[in-house]
Amino acid sequence: MEPKYQRILIKLSGEALAGDKGVGIDIPTVQSIAKEIAEVHNSGVQIALVIGGGNLWRGEPAAEAGMDRVQADYTGMLGTVMNALVMADSLQQYGVDTRVQTAIPMQTVAEPYVRGRALRHLEKNRIVVFGAGIGSPYFSTDTTAALRAAEIEAEAILMAKNGVDGVYNADPKKDANAVKFDELTHVEVIKRGLKIMDATASTISMDNDIDLVVFNMNETGNIKRVVLGEQIGTTVSNKASE
């Protein structure tokens, strides 16, 4: 079956790497995620990754507790680099040539982010893991994902969620009558105020015609199903459903 998308960016939360522990990095969990990503990669799909850092650090609560916000955000960026290095190692163990590129130069452990080099890696069937956000405070890893997806001309951002199987009109944990959307447009997401990504990330995705697929990553095989075009989760695009 021909993949629906040829080049994708997968956005993982940092908590996804923590497993049942909720914090830190659980290596078996990382290996399980890496195995699934490697299988999709081996089908010929070009893949980039952005991983959050919430399993290790959260800048906003630290700032609210009195830490300088800029310093707090930079600390969080370093957390995303740790996650990127661990994921890259697991992908390498599954035989996938992988590169880590960081927005803040740290040549001893990773390449500096260079768009042209990232594109060449993808064209050579390497996975690229982007770390350190966009290198500036006040920007989320959602914005990083949208910006990098636009820069590498990805067709879709796969928002892999922990236990969340799509986008609802209300919180399904609080409202038994919450309805899941199969499809939405970027404009509808912004108008409804649905918190899939922050506003900056949503606008970048809309302006660059990048599909956004929100799905439950806890079900094995879901990444592959999304890439093959199966209707799971919620797909957000510029095209209204017919």
From Swiss-Prot:
Top-level class of the enzyme under EC nomenclature: transferase
Regulation affecting activity: Allosterically activated by GTP. Inhibited by UTP.
Gene Ontology cellular component list: cytoplasm
Catalytic activity: UMP + ATP = UDP + ADP
A GO BP annotation: UDP biosynthetic process
Residues of the signal peptide: none
Keyword set, alphabetical order: Allosteric enzyme, ATP-binding, Cytoplasm, Kinase, Nucleotide-binding, Pyrimidine biosynthesis, Transferase
The protein's Enzyme Commission number: 2.7.4.22
Claim: RNA-binding is one of the keywords in the record: no
Pathways involved: Pyrimidine metabolism; CTP biosynthesis via de novo pathway; UDP from UMP (UMPK route): step 1/1
Region listing for Involved in allosteric activation by GTP, in residue ranges: 19-24
Segments forming a coiled coil: none
Tree of life domain: Bacteria
Binding site for UMP: 53, 73, 134-141
Cell compartment(s), UniProt: Cytoplasm
MF term (GO), any: ATP binding
Subunit and partners: Homohexamer.
Function: Catalyzes the reversible phosphorylation of UMP to UDP.
UniProt-listed NCBIfam families: pyrH_bact
Family statement drawn from the similarity comment of this UniProt entry: Belongs to the UMP kinase family.
Protein's name according to its UniProt entry: Uridylate kinase
Originating species: Streptococcus agalactiae serotype V (strain ATCC BAA-611 / 2603 V/R)
